[in-house]
Amino acid sequence: AAKPHDNVANGLGYLWNPTKVLMEKTTPAAEDKPREIVGAKALEEAKAEVAASGGALKLREVGVMEQLWNPSLWLAAAGQIFFSRSVGFSVIIVYASYMKKNDDVVLSGLTASSANEFCEVGLGGLITVPAAVAFLGVAGVAGQAGVGLGFKILPLVFSKMPAGAFFGGAFFFMLFLAAVTSSISMLQPGIAFVEESLGVGRKASVTILGLLTTFGTGFVLYFTANLKALDTLDFWIGTFLIFVLATIQIIIFGWKWGIDRGFEELHRGAAIRVPWIFRPIIKWICPGFLLSIFVMWLMKEIFGYDFAKGSMGAVSGYVTDLFGEKSNLPAQLSMALVIAIFVFFGLLTARSKAYARAEQGLPKHD
């Protein structure tokens, strides 16, 4: 049957969806999660279910300000931005070490950031989400992850295009190349690290890192039930740890390195200058903002304080998966794997001659 309300225009409206309707228990337990109600038909069914529950269920409207009080939302958003810009892990630091002294960091950084956001938001979100609403409807889109949604929707879009098979094949082939090159770029810091810490050649370094990567990939593939291992590693490493390390990096740049010295290096060879206003932003506002998000996240997800309601709520599932009565073995093994890798690389660093020379203020090589 035709569904005229499922169209691209409504999909664009769905992107700006500041108000949500949740159905939840009147007296929820710690493990109970509210269910989001999307669409007019679903809302009518939810109202009937609430009326028949005898007061056990209720509908609650969540406005934009209440959602903005959720520190997990800010942590996830910041983690995504840092990951897409390679900030918060060693990639950007390693590749920066290969630059020449007078290379233009300002213009190239501005170009890369602008192009990245245009592709992610403009070409990604503004194409995928409206198309998903047109094909699946609002209820079919709600709660789905962006990457998985794209793989489901874009083939449908290409199937409706002239020469869609050609354009679809070309798109996913280029996506494959982008994924391969991105993976290689993220392996380079580890390769360089093993080379310096062990004093081995590139072949030996690639072999060691390849074995570690193969083991980690096999571990995730083995624990595929509910994607628990992948989800655990993605959150604690791909979101939480990147956020923490990015916060540390900006504090080091603004305070340890020094904002004046940093801007002097930043403008060396630059075609344009960074406005003065970014000095207090980098030194004061960004660290304060990121630390505030981190503290609020700890209070909400670790200690269970709900800022929107001003009362105690549920602890994060990522925490209860690791500790407590409802701990999850794949999640615990995932974190044990991460800790083991940290210890391994920590031991490599401790015995590294290059690290010892750096501690003494000496150059890396004689």
Question: PLM features: what roles do these ranges have?
Answer:
Residues 231-246, 275-366:
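A generic transmembrane alpha-helix motif of multi-pass inner-membrane proteins
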Residues 25-26, 30-33, 45-54, 265, ...:
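Extramembrane terminal tails and long inter-domain/linker segments of multi-pass membrane proteins
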Residues 179-183, 241-255:
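Generic alpha-helical transmembrane segments
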Residues 116-127, 213-220, 242-249, 341, ...:
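Alpha-helical transmembrane segments of multipass membrane proteins
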Residues 1-9, 70-73, 100-104, 127-139, ...:
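Transmembrane helix-loop junctions in multi-pass membrane proteins
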Residues 1-180, 184, 197-198, 204-208, ...:
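Membrane-embedded translocation segments of transport machinery
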